[in-house]
Amino acid sequence: MGTPGSGRKRTPVKDRFSAEDEALSNIAREAEARLAAKRAARAEARDIRMRELERQQREGVEDTLSLRSLGSHRLDEKSDKQYAENYTRPSSRNSASATTPLSGQSSRRGSGDTSSLIDPDTSLSELRESLSEVEEKYKKAMVSNAQLDNEKNNLIYQVDTLKDVIEEQEEQMAEFYRENEEKSKELERQKHMCSVLQHKMDELKEGLRQRDELIEKHGLVIIPDSTPNGDVHHEPVVGAITAVSQEAAQVLESAGEGPLDVRLRKLAGEKDELLSQIRKLKLQLEEERQKCSRNDGMSGDLAGLQNGSDLQFIEMQRDANRQISEYKFKLSKAEQDIATLEQSISRLEGQVLRYKTAAENAEKIEDELKAERRKLQRELRTAQDKIEEMEMTNSHLAKRLEKMKANRTALLAQQ
């Protein structure tokens, strides 16, 4: 008694999705390689920027020192020139007044000019003080300029670092989204497998229903058997049943309680006993026939006795023949019932084993799919939490970047 679709083997869903999984793994490997190359390029660019910043700082310090030395040299030259002019100008004017006679007004003006340039030490000290003040201001300006330049370079470096961090966060976000899509696809595949298994289970249930209908239609009786082959197991066998006719069920009930194999062995023993009795009766019949053939040659005076013994023998022979015919009928009926029972047992055992194996496989696959579904749901929740955390980190970094840009613009405005 077969059921629809009981002997077919379906192609596993895993083999159908192997090409897609391989393509996804290749894409993931290529993305990881590109990510590693980008990271290496960013590290190299960061090193180059650091070296460039160090070079610019060194050049700025050297330019500051050169400008400072140049300014001090120019100020020294200017002070020396003024000092020389202060000492050469009065002597020339005195010689001119001695050689050429001038009026009193010119002599008074010349005396006033010389009196204004008489103190060269005072003017030189004032120039040196002003020079020192200018140098101090210049030094302070250069130091503040260098500090601002360093702060500017540091801010630029921090901005570049934050840009790299944001790029990495975006790449991680993209990777998380890709993993989420892969997990979603895997979840869809698992759902498809669940639907396929549910369809198989429905088919098995339909087959069981048809089996029950056929059993009821043909008037069969289901006999449970928990210990097949007379073996004693620690764990009971689930679903071991046998469908037989009502006559066979009555015969099995007459055999007593116990497993089906034990009752069949009892019936086989009774059959052997009946066969042995039939053989004994046949031997007795042959002996009686031989006795009859020997008694046929006896004298006529014993005819009355022989007739009486013949009547008794005929009655015995009739009884024996009747018993033999009854035993033969019972034997043939028992043989037919046993053959029918054996065929039903073998057929139903095969069906039960198939149904049991299919049900166990379906239960195992269902449990595995449920566990995989729970695992995927946990991973999905973890990925969503990570995505939310990365979004919060990204927004925080964006706020910090805006704040640093505002500080930078404020510093540039102050300069």
Curated annotation (Swiss-Prot):
InterPro entries: LRRFIP1/2. Gene3D superfamilies: 1.20.5.4090. Disulfide bonds: none annotated. It comes from the Eukaryota. Residues 22-49, 121-217, 260-408 form a coiled coil. Residues 52-61, 73-83 have a biased composition (Basic and acidic residues). The keyword Coiled coil applies. One of its GO terms (biological process) is Wnt signaling pathway. The modification Phosphoserine is found at residues 18, 92, 95, 103, 107, 111, 115-116. Keywords: Coiled coil, Phosphoprotein, Wnt signaling pathway. Pfam families: LRRFIP (PF09738). The modification Phosphothreonine is found at residue 114. Residues 1-20, 52-130 are annotated as: Disordered. Residues 88-117 have a biased composition (Polar residues). Interacts with DVL3 and FLII. Weakly interacts with MYD88 in resting cells. Following LPS-stimulation, the interaction with MYD88 is rapidly enhanced; the complex gradually dissociates to basal levels after 6 hours of stimulation. Interaction with MYD88 is regulated by LPS-induced phosphorylation. In the presence of LPS, competes with FLII for MYD88-binding. May function as activator of the canonical Wnt signaling pathway, in association with DVL3, upstream of CTNNB1/beta-catenin. Positively regulates Toll-like receptor (TLR) signaling in response to agonist probably by competing with the negative FLII regulator for MYD88-binding. Belongs to the LRRFIP family. This is Leucine-rich repeat flightless-interacting protein 2. It comes from Mus musculus. The lineage of its organism: Eukaryota, Metazoa, Chordata, Craniata, Vertebrata. The gene is Lrrfip2.
